[in-house]
From Swiss-Prot:
Self-association state and partner proteins as the record states: Part of the 50S ribosomal subunit. Forms a cluster with proteins L3 and L19. In the 70S ribosome, L14 and L19 interact and together make contacts with the 16S rRNA in bridges B5 and B8.
Record SUPFAM superfamilies: Ribosomal protein L14
CDD domains: Ribosomal_uL14
Protein name (Swiss-Prot/TrEMBL): Large ribosomal subunit protein uL14
Amino acid sequence: MIQTQSMLDVADNSGARRVMCIKVLGGSHRRYAGIGDIIKVTVKEAIPRGKVKKGQVMTAVVVRTRHGVRRADGSIIRFDGNAAVLLNNKQEPIGTRIFGPVTRELRNEKFMKIVSLAPEVL
């Protein structure tokens, strides 16, 4: 569960390393975001010569959370950390590579590009 002020790792090669959630999109008083939800983030740590710079405000989709996601069969998939993939204005990933596993829930959320780039889909 991601909320305002949550720090996330970036799971792509856009140039950002750490981002902070500044808003959960999808409702005026929505408090938490889970896997597949879109959030507004600010870049807190970036590598030199990357596509994004420190301080930029971006849109991102949550791909991994410590809280995890519950499946219909009752199983829960949890991860060691929280991670997001940065998006452009057309809701497409900025990076060309995705690092680490992602869940099948992203397939329903119109993020097939992220699922196809990911090395492992759980």
